[in-house]
Amino acid sequence: MMSNYGNMMDSPKSSPHGGGRSPVVARQDSSGTLKTTISLGKTPTIIHTGPFYSMKEPPAKAELTGDKDLMTEYGLHHTLTKFKEKKFKESLASFLQNIPGINDLITHPVENSTLRSVIEKPPIGGKELLPLTPVQLAGFRLHPGPLPEQYRTTYVTPARKHKNKHKKQKHKDGVTTGQESTLLDSAGLETYEKKHKKQKRHEDDKERKKRKKEKKRKKKNQSPEPGVGLLPGGASLGGAAGVMGATSLGSLGGGPGGPGLSSLSASMGPGVVGNMNSFSSSMQMQQQQQMPMQQQQMSSGGLLGSVLGTSGGPGGGGGGGGGGGGGVGGSLLMSQF
């Protein structure tokens, strides 16, 4: 026994300071272990106290357990049947306490006085429309007084966002905000650009028309007039025509430069000139339309006249009178060709 006691004293469980375990750590439950008391003295003795096995006393028997029906125990079946069969008519104020005004419209119960009863059992009528009774209309009555604050938020309409339109808004004070001023400036710039583009197009069209007119004027100035430009060439052609007429008539007569032929050429000259002068006015319009072709004809006519004038021969001296008179007529005839 003394050796066991020594072992118990040296064990870490028995010594509070020895061993690696802290005394704060909870130890295992020793309810099932053997309980002993040691008396120290001259003769130390170990006294066994308590039972060998730790056994708890069973709980006392309860009156109400889970196998019993509480409704029968307390007698609540009768009250349950009454609660099921009874129809409660609770007032409106019992579950809607925050609504202002008189909530209970009718204190005494009246049949067909609720809106539900009218919906479930509508009044039977014929084709005619019968008005509801005042008792039935009581279900549709609105209570006087303002709407409570807790329900006002549901009926508040959200503020509509103002869309910025590109229109000039006139203010009474004449003061425009920054956003409106920027909108006005942008709109003004757009209109100015559109007007500027239209103005440019108009100016371009005017310039094109002016250029066309100037080109036409230059062409008219460069081309010589029919009466003035044909005189030098016409004179040469007239002389050549006179030479040609004299030589041809002289050859037909059989002698160069005879007196009868010269008088014949002189008599033919004024008549041809008169006829050609009357015809020249109608031909001037055609000459203006065919200016480039006339210039080519004039150059070729002048060349022909110069050739004929130089190579006339003896016929030119014999037909002098006819050549003088037929100069203008020859020029007009050559202009036609």
UniProtKB/Swiss-Prot annotation:
Disulfide bonds: none annotated. Residues 28-38 have a biased composition (Polar residues). Keywords: Activator, Coiled coil, Nucleus, Transcription, Transcription regulation. One of its GO terms (molecular function) is transcription coregulator activity. Residues 189-223 form a coiled coil. Residues 310-330 have a biased composition (Gly residues). GO terms for biological process: positive regulation of transcription by RNA polymerase II; regulation of transcription by RNA polymerase II. Residues 297-309 have a biased composition (Low complexity). Residues 159-171, 208-221 have a biased composition (Basic residues). It is found in: Nucleus. Pfam families: Med19 (PF10278). Residues 1-38, 155-234, 297-337 are annotated as: Disordered. The keyword Iron-sulfur does not apply. It comes from the Eukaryota. GO terms for cellular component: mediator complex. Component of the Mediator complex, a coactivator involved in the regulated transcription of nearly all RNA polymerase II-dependent genes. Mediator functions as a bridge to convey information from gene-specific regulatory proteins to the basal RNA polymerase II transcription machinery. Mediator is recruited to promoters by direct interactions with regulatory proteins and serves as a scaffold for the assembly of a functional preinitiation complex with RNA polymerase II and the general transcription factors. Component of the Mediator complex. PANTHER family: LUNG CANCER METASTASIS-RELATED LCMR1 PROTEIN, MEDIATOR OF RNA POLYMERASE II TRANSCRIPTION SUBUNIT 19. This is Mediator of RNA polymerase II transcription subunit 19. The gene is MED19.
